[in-house]
Every structure is written in C-alpha cells, then in structure tokens.
Amino acid sequence: MELILRADVENLGRLGDKVSVKPGYGRNYLIPQGLAMLATPANLRRFENESKKLQAKRDALIADAKGLADRLAEIAIVIEVRVGEGAKLYGSVTTAIIADKLAELGFDIDRKKIVLAEPIRSLGHYDVPVKLLPELRGSVKVSVVRQGGPEDEEIAEAAPVAEAQAEADGHSTEETA
C-alpha cells in the first residue's frame, strides 16, 4: 500500500515521504491517526497544497523543541534514593522516575522519550538524553544522591578518612568503640 506521510513517523519516514507499508498498518493506524493518506494522483495534488502549511507547522514544532532542549539543558534533577552497604541502590532509577521529576518541574515529557540504555543503579551524576524529535535530542542532568541529603554523603566520605587516620595513629576504631 502506497502512502504519503503527513507527519514524521518513527522508523518509517518524514513528512512528505512516499512510503510503502502493509495494508493493515496503513488502514488501521496511519490513515485513521492522520499520519498518512493514500498516494493517489488527487491526494498528491492535495498534499502539495497542504505541504506549505505542514512545513510551517513542522518548523514551529522544531523551534519549540529547540527551546525545550535549551531549557532542559539548564536544569538539574536530584533524585534521592535509599542506599545499602557499598553505596548500592535499593532498586534503580528508571525513565519513569525521571519523567515524574520532570513533570514536577513543569515539563511534559513522556518516559518513552527518555533514553537510558539500562536503569541507573549507582550514585552519581548523569547526563540523560531526551529524544524530542527524531532528529533532535536534548539532555537533562540527573544527580542520584543518598536519601537524607548530602550530609549523609559527607559523613560516609569522612568515615573512611577517620578510620585511616586512627589506624595511622596506632588506634583501631573497633577498640575505641
């Protein structure tokens, strides 16, 4: 089935492309969703008339996405997690958690657009890509910290230093306790 795309469709084509798809996909999804129309001579002429409007709409969409990418680059999300021994997370930080944090900040981004190869399972700072359009990606800074705030991290970082210093002085931390 030959169709003309009226919008960008992931893994298929871009606005204005003439594509060949299976009849069921075209009839049951692309055409009813307004993403494509049959590639008949009449529709080709109609599409040429609509293409200027659609291209203007697409340009506006790209401009909005670039603005969103700039705003995302400016923010940093802090996610507090419970941590066990050895700084190992209980569970993991997933795209859904990141999307919820973005929603709290007023960004309406679907979790499927957040790109993580695998969930985050350790403390640290991450630069997480967000797919805004097929050809445009933004990124958001995500910091995964120990629940209870940075004070706990400072205490945890200070403890090995105190133990090393006590051992250097000839005292064991276990003997004093």
Curated annotation (Swiss-Prot):
Composition skew (Low complexity), residue ranges: 157-167
UniProtKB keywords: Ribonucleoprotein, Ribosomal protein, RNA-binding, rRNA-binding
Database matches in Gene3D superfamilies: Ribosomal protein L9, C-terminal domain, Ribosomal protein L9, N-terminal domain
Pfam families: Ribosomal_L9_C (PF03948), Ribosomal_L9_N (PF01281)
Compositionally biased spans, kind Basic and acidic residues: 168-177
Top-level taxonomic group: Bacteria
Listed GO biological process terms: translation
Any GO MF annotation of the entry: rRNA binding
Span list, region Disordered: 151-177
GO cellular component terms listed in the entry, alphabetical order: ribonucleoprotein complex; ribosome
Coiled coil: none
SUPFAM superfamilies attached to this UniProt entry: L9 N-domain-like (SSF55658), Ribosomal protein L9 C-domain (SSF55653)
InterPro entries linked to this entry: Ribosomal_bL9 (IPR000244), Ribosomal_bL9/RNase_H1_N (IPR009027), Ribosomal_bL9_bac/chp (IPR020594), Ribosomal_bL9_C (IPR020069), Ribosomal_bL9_C_sf (IPR036791), Ribosomal_bL9_N (IPR020070), Ribosomal_bL9_N_sf (IPR036935)
Family: Belongs to the bacterial ribosomal protein bL9 family.
Function comment: Binds to the 23S rRNA.
Record protein name field: Large ribosomal subunit protein bL9
The organism of origin for this protein: Solidesulfovibrio magneticus (strain ATCC 700980 / DSM 13731 / RS-1) (Desulfovibrio magneticus)
UniProt lineage: Bacteria, Pseudomonadati, Thermodesulfobacteriota, Desulfovibrionia, Desulfovibrionales
